[in-house]
From Swiss-Prot:
Residues 2-142 form the PTS EIIA type-2 domain. The gene is fruB(HI). This is Multiphosphoryl transfer protein. It comes from Rhodobacter capsulatus (Rhodopseudomonas capsulata). The PTS EIIA type-2 domain is phosphorylated by phospho-HPr on a histidyl residue. Then, it transfers the phosphoryl group to the PTS EIIB type-2 domain. The modification Phosphohistidine is found at H62, H171, H457.
Length: 827
């Protein structure tokens, strides 16, 4: 307890402003020999980054932790201001309690102050008394209330024990973190420190505990999500409760890039926040630029139908060639998967019904521009209104392709500059593939869209270009005017409007830390992912072509966990032959130089179409002829691919994987065909596995495991099939989270079935490359994580700094959660 005498209490003072009030308190402390006068500057420095107004007319100015060497002797000084002084907008301080504490001796003073915060009459008495002894007695605890104390609430039945580790106890900042966390759960939470019990959702109540370093707290909870709440709180205490005075200046996000869930970050930012979905991690500070497409105007009518028809044909042909050039450019810079969308756009331009309908309108006296605009707009509107999310999502592609033709049929009327010419954060309702292909990463520091989700085209491009991005922010995003300064936190899915200097400093610190972290990860990328307690997790890469095979090795991948062979079949007029496929597989094996590769057989259907294969139009393509079903119904393609794979297997460690297995019969048929092909080419046996991405496969996993060498869990499809949510859906994308407990329980069942059959389990998909997901999956027993190439080094580093025992405990607690948000709150 800090001794307080009347000499350090100034009664009946006035102050012109907050700085004057603090200066008077500093004078008292300096005159008493308690501090160096420069500590006053530290107190003002604290005010620049935090509000020290407690409430009920009481403020507690104190210095920054790095300036404690300016404190000679721990002390407090009180300046009474009966007339008050504005401390912050809307807050008037009448009792200024200046604290100069070397450690946690001041906690009892804070505890006594919290009693006053809940008693307006007592606060008024202290702000107007003419006797300094009254204030001294109240702050030192000598004037305890006379009334009999109320009965202390009992602990709830379910609880945990934690210890306060912070050097300065449970002071305001860590207590605020704890309150914010507790409020995220419906359960009632109580925290006991000896005889005192606090409401875990009340800052005042928590401060009243007076919990110093080393205090043993009993935390109990009651309610439907009590187990999850206690698990999250235990993890928060273990992590230090975001106490900057003990953990240093680095922002929490710098340690875990890629986390979605904006709650923790929002609580830390002072500026107004807009919340969306994390699309690409990282930070950006820049003015916004509102993306606007050029407007094309055209005449409604035209007299010469033949001339207008020729204009339409020429515009269609010109647009087709533009798309061809754009396809080739994107292929070179971003790979075939990114370029494939432009082939689809070319198909729109060849649609015979659209062209015929437009020409019919021209024959009725309409201009080519009017006719084409009417036709593609009507069809886009029809697509956008469809209930099927895949089809409705095509509307933006059709409008993009249609607009490309239209610009050759009318006059371009430019409003805003089409693309930015200075560094900015680009805002848009959504971006088409054509838009994103033209972005200059040197100027676009960040991306934010009102629509979309983490698997939208914009998000995929942002990650490929390493641009921080937030999607699905909503219409209010577009209320921001060009030039508005913002901070974009891609990992948290947050945009901070007009960030304060403290927000900017925090982001700049985090950016510097993130850069340093990535540089360290890059230097250590070839180290194995061996946990601190000796468990090995292999981190491999998802690839689509030879260039990515080379890049995966350079990135530190320990092999390829998923080769998407679809890229061999797209952007061409006929399927590749056996020798062509063999040459490509052999080139990949050469690039991997002995590292293993899992080759997934052709996986088309659903949202992956190949025009020349004449795939049937299905009402529900995701529930139709997908994956292995397509291969079994096109056995000639399947056998050709298997022959190429088996022939290539002589040159390296090849494993074969069948996609979208739903039933035992599918697997047995696929294995029979594969064995027939192997014997035909005279190849040695290779490991054969299946993807677990359909709930029926999970339920049949014990039987399936007896028939394969490994499982690979496709978390993206498993999530959408388990939750009945298309991960591309503009509304449901936010909820289609692979860390939902329902999905995790399916994964847990799969792993246990595999372990019983003594086969290994890998995972690919979004959560394998997510920091929380990697920890949970490894804790569940997944032994191989296949991630995007840019994520390899970071996931390996994270696993090297973790303990498998802790990951198993995290996984156990995650399985007990009821929502994805609870799971993400565990770590």
């Amino acid at each position: 307890m800090i001794p307080l005498t009347s000499e350090l209490v100034a009664i009946g003072k006035t102050a012109t402003d907050k700085a004057d009030a603090i200066a008077q308190a500093v004078d008292l402390l300096t005159a008493a020999g308690k501090i160096d006068p420069r500590y006053g500057q530290s107190m003002m420095g604290r005010e620049a980054v935090a509000n020290t107004f407690l409430g009920n007319g009481i403020a507690i100015p104190h210095g920054l932790p790095q300036d404690r060497d300016l404190i000679h002797d721990t002390a407090i000084a009180v300046v009474q201001l009966p007339a008050g002084v504005e401390w912050a907008p809307g807050d008037t301080a009448r009792l200024v309690v200046a604290i100069a504490a070397k450690s946690d001796e001041h906690l009892q003073v804070l505890s006594n102050l919290t009693d006053v915060l809940g008693d307006e009459a007592e606060a008024e008495r202290l702000a107007t008394t003419l006797d300094a002894a009254v204030i001294v007695a109240r702050l030192t605890g000598a004037a305890a209330p006379v009334a009999a104390p109320a009965e202390t609430p009992a602990d709830f039945a379910q609880g945990i024990d934690v210890v306060v580790t912070g050097a300065h106890g449970l002071h305001a900042r860590p207590a605020t973190t704890l309150v914010d966390l507790a409020k995220g759960f419906a359960a009632e939470i109580r925290i006991r420190n000896g005889a005192k019990v606090a409401n875990g959702k009340s800052l005042i109540s928590l401060l009243n505990l007076g919990a110093a370093q080393g205090a043993a707290l009993r935390i109990s909870a009651e309610g439907a999500d009590a187990t999850a709440a206690l698990a999250a709180i235990a993890a928060a205490f273990e992590a230090g409760l975001e106490d900057e005075e003990d953990t240093g200046a680095a922002a929490p996000e710098a340690a875990t890039p890629g986390l979605t869930g904006a709650g923790a970050s929002m609580a830390s930012y002072e500026g107004r926040t807009l919340v969306g979905i994390s699309s690409s991690p990282g930070y950006a500070l820049a003015p916004v630029f509102r993306f606007a497409r050029d407007e094309v105007v055209f005449d409604t009518d035209a007299a010469d139908a033949a001339f207008e028809t020729d204009r339409l044909d020429t515009a269609l042909q010109t647009a087709w060639h533009e798309l061809e050039e754009l396809h080739d450019e994107v292929w070179k810079t971003s790979g075939p998967a990114r370029a494939a969308i432009f082939r689809a756009h070319q198909e729109f331009l060849h649609d015979p019904e659209m062209v015929a309908e437009a020409k019919a309108l021209i024959g009725q006296g309409r201009s080519a521009g009017f006719a084409w605009h009417r036709v593609f707009s009507d069809r886009a509107d029809m697509l956008g209104a469809m209930k099927d999310a895949v089809l409705s999502g095509r509307a933006i592609d059709l409008r993009d392709a249609g607009q490309r033709v239209l610009q050759h049929l009318g006059r371009v009327r430019t409003g805003e500059t089409h693309l930015p010419t200075a560094p900015c954060i680009l805002l848009a309702d959504d971006l088409t593939p054509s838009d994103t292909a033209r972005l200059d990463p040197a100027l676009v520091r960040g991306l934010a869209t009102a629509q979309g989700g983490p698997t939208s085209h914009t998000s995929i491009i942002a990650r490929a270009l390493d641009i921080p991005a937030v999607a699905g922010v909503g219409p209010r995003l577009l209320d921001l005017a060009t030039g508005t300064p913002v901070l974009l936190d891609g990992g948290a899915g947050v945009i901070v409007v007009a960030p304060t200097e403290a927000d900017k400093a925090r982001a700049e610190t985090a950016m510097a830390a993130l850069t340093a972290q990535r540089e360290l990860e890059a230097r250590e990328r070839y180290k194995p992912a061996l946990t601190v307690d000796g468990a090995r997790v292999e981190v491999v890469a998802n690839i689509s072509d030879v260039a990515e095979a080379i890049a995966s090795v350079e990135a530190g991948a320990e092999g390829v966990g998923l080769l998407r062979t679809e890229f061999l079949f797209v952007n061409r007029e006929a399927p590749p032959g056996e020798d062509e496929q063999l040459a490509i597989y052999a080139a990949m094996l050469s690039a991997l130089n002995g590292l293993p590769i899992i080759i997934r057989t052709l996986d088309v259907g659903g949202d992956k179409e190949i025009p020349y294969l004449r795939m049937p139009v299905e009402q529900n393509p995701f529930l139709g002829e997908r994956g292995i079903r397509f291969c079994l119904s096109h056995e000639d393609l399947f056998r050709t691919q298997l022959r190429a794979i088996y022939r290539a297997s002589a040159g390296g460690q090849v494993r074969i994987m069948f996609p979208m297995i739903a039933m035992i019969e599918e697997l047995e048929t696929a294995r029979r065909i594969a064995e027939e092909v192997r014997l035909e080419v005279g190849a040695a046996p290779v490991e054969i596995g299946i993807m677990i991405e359909i709930p029926s496969a999970v339920m049949m996993a014990p039987e399936l495991a007896k028939r394969v060498d490994f499982f690979s869990i496709g978390t993206n499809d498993l999530t959408q099939y388990a939750l009945a949510m298309d991960r591309m859906h503009p509304v449901l994308a936010k909820q289609a989270d692979g860390l939902h407990p329902a999905v995790l329980r399916l994964i847990d069942s799969t792993v246990r079935a595999a372990e019983a059959a003594r086969i290994w389990v890998g995972a690919c998909g979004g959560i394998a490359g997510d920091p929380v997901g990697a920890a949970v999956l490894s804790g569940l027993g997944v032994r191989e994580l296949s991630v995007s190439i840019p994520a390899v080094a970071g996931i390996k580093a994270q696993l090297r700094h973790s303990a498998m025992a802790e990951n198993r405990d995290l996984a156990r607690r995650a399985l007990a959660c009821t929502t994805a948000a609870e799971v993400r709150g565990l770590k």
